[in-house]
């Protein structure tokens, strides 16, 4: 196994969303960090990885957020009524993975499969709305501070395909 720096770009989508909710433009997550390997066998091809990283997410949709008496509410609006409607989050993340690969001490082109759990802590959140009639920004949105999800990564050589499914609504 090997320690690794990681860099990932994910397409973000909601699996449970309000009626008439639509994502528009490209909603994405960029994450990067470091994972330390702890091998379980002499071949060093099975073990666990523990790490720390940073996650930057941007979500574009027709869900308009408003601040009403220090309480944030949301409503579905027509996508043609605004020019910008997105929220951004910054999180510190802590991945834990069970790791298996076909590597040998001399072969660096190998298959890999990693299953794991990622826990993250929300550091910052920001919402921006722009239309012909209204422009405003909200910060420190009432999102859950601690979030967890299941991860699956599989790949060959230097490329991986990764999936993340959040466990918290």
Predicted regions and their residues:
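Residues on the lipid-exposed face of transmembrane beta-strands in outer-membrane beta-barrel proteins
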Residues: 32-38, 52-54, 94-100, 115-119, ...
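Outer-membrane beta-barrel proteins
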Residues: 13-15, 35-41, 99-104, 158, ...
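Short loop/turn motifs that connect adjacent beta-strands in outer-membrane beta-barrel proteins
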Residues: 1-3, 39-46, 103-111
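Extracellular/periplasm-exposed beta-strand and loop segments of Gram-negative cell-envelope proteins
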Residues: 18-25, 59-69, 74-89, 122-132, ...
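Structural signature of outer-membrane beta-barrel domains
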Residues: 12-14, 53-59, 118-124, 166-168
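Surface-exposed strand-loop-strand hairpins of Gram-negative outer-membrane beta-barrel proteins
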Residues: 12-33
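Predominantly the C-terminal beta-signal and adjacent terminal strand-loop region
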Residues: 139-169
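N-terminal targeting leaders of membrane proteins
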Residues: 1-8, 12
């Amino acid at each position: 196994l090997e320690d690794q720096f990681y860099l990932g770009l994910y397409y973000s989508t909601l699996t449970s969303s309000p009626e008439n909710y639509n994502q528009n433009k490209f909603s994405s997550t960029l994450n990067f960090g470091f994972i330390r390997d702890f091998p379980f066998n002499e071949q060093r091809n099975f073990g666990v990885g523990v790490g720390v990283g940073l996650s930057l997410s941007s979500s574009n949709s027709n869900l308009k957020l408003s601040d009403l008496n220090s309480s944030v509410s949301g409503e579905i609006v027509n996508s043609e009524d605004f020019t910008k409607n997105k929220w951004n989050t910054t999180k510190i993340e802590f991945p834990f993975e069970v790791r298996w690969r076909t590597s040998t001490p001399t072969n660096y082109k190998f298959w890999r499969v990693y299953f794991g759990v990622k826990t993250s802590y929300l550091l910052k959140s920001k919402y921006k709305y722009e239309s012909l009639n209204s422009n405003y920004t909200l910060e420190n949105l009432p999102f859950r501070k601690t979030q967890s999800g299941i991860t699956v990564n599989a790949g060959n050589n230097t490329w991986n395909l990764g999936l993340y499914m959040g466990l918290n609504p």
